[in-house]
From Swiss-Prot:
Taxonomic placement: Eukaryota, Metazoa, Ecdysozoa, Arthropoda, Hexapoda
Sites of Leucine amide modification: L10
Name under which the protein is recorded: Locustapyrokinin-2
Function: Mediates visceral muscle contractile activity (myotropic activity).
Organism encoding this protein: Locusta migratoria
PROSITE patterns listed in its UniProt record: PYROKININ
GO biological process terms on file: neuropeptide signaling pathway
Annotated Gene Ontology cellular component terms: extracellular region
Length: 10
């Protein structure tokens, strides 16, 4: 998977 997964930062 080339597209990185979005990780929300709180």
């Amino acid at each position: 998977q080339s597209v990185p997964t979005f990780t929300p930062r709180l």
